[in-house]
Amino acid sequence: MTDGAEACPGASKVKSKKAKVKSELSMKENDLKDRLFQFAIGVLKMLGNLKVAKETDVIKYQLSKSATSSGANYEESQAAVSKADFINKVGISLKEMRESNYWLRIIKELFPKTENIVYLVGESEELGKILASILIKSRN
């Protein structure tokens, strides 16, 4: 008995292309996971250096939760048990990123000289767009 590759000469090329596409998708997923992780670390470091004041305590608490939750929910989406579960987790990740962007913009407005704040606001916007794109494509 022969395997499919011997029966169809072009089969190995097709398998090779599929493996390459899958590998590229996996690398993109890892890039996003890494970016979400680094975003959370960057936010936590920035918050550690932020002025201690009564009015910033709530912002610091909320931002630390939303910035870390976005990555955590995306990680959970990678082990989803169904398409609906995947969409739900990515949707939560997007909502948390949008919340992070909101808190970061408040910090930027109140404390414009905060180290890395411009970068973090921009990164939250980019990550939000990526997550929204994944969500839209997953729903189709």
Regions found by a protein language model. Give the residues of each.
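Short, C-terminally biased terminal segments at protein or domain edges
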Residues: 1-76, 80-140
